[in-house]
Amino acid sequence: MDSNWSAEKFLTGEFENNLGSHCKLIAKDGKITGEYFTKPSRGKLIQPGFPVNGIYTPVKDGALLTMIVTYKIEGVKENGLERYSQATWNGKVYSSKKDFKMNWLLLNNEDENNEWAATNLGQDHFTKKN
């Protein structure tokens, strides 16, 4: 482990994932804030960047990490309400690497008849850009 490495320093910066999405993060005192710019989408997103909130916990060889983003999809209404989806990522950053993998859950706002289709899951590979 690099003796100069810190979770706060590493997690503050810009990252890109394997799908071409990127995020700008600020890590301080165990909390993460920033903006997430998603590339893949099933609809036109209401804004280019979405707020990121999360937490991290420093551990001996890196940090445990959780992030959440809520997406608003433009022009799609359900029962008069705007369409939203929400994603969470969980993973571990190793102090010996500049990249990391995070498992994600994407929850779409579906009515109870389509509840089975509401949740998708997968894994993203993030690389620090700066």
Feature map (PLM): residue ranges:
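Central antiparallel beta-sheet cores of small beta-barrel/beta-sandwich binding domains
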Residues: 2-96, 120
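Edge beta-strand at a domain terminus
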Residues: 1-2, 51, 56, 97-130
